UniProtKB/Swiss-Prot annotation:
Keyword Plastid: no
NCBIfam families for this protein: PRK05408.1
Organism encoding this protein: Baumannia cicadellinicola subsp. Homalodisca coagulata
Protein name: Probable Fe(2+)-trafficking protein
Any one Gene Ontology cellular component term annotated for this protein: cytosol
Amino acid sequence: MSKNIYCVFLRKQAEGQDFQSYPGELGKHIFNNISKEAWAKWQQKQTMLINENKLNLISNTDRNFLEKEMIKFLFKS
């Protein structure tokens, strides 16, 4: 059973994620502050970015671009 958290993206209490979806300290921050609903919205946006920009996730440059976009989307919206 998931815990409720204050989601900084939705700006309200919401169901937290079941597990840490992203590695490292950033992943811990996302797990503690981003709800399941907000993470699902990011996954949709991420898919659009990958397709529209023809990103190659093997490329460090493309992965770094995607990570910056994720931070902007989740924490600066």
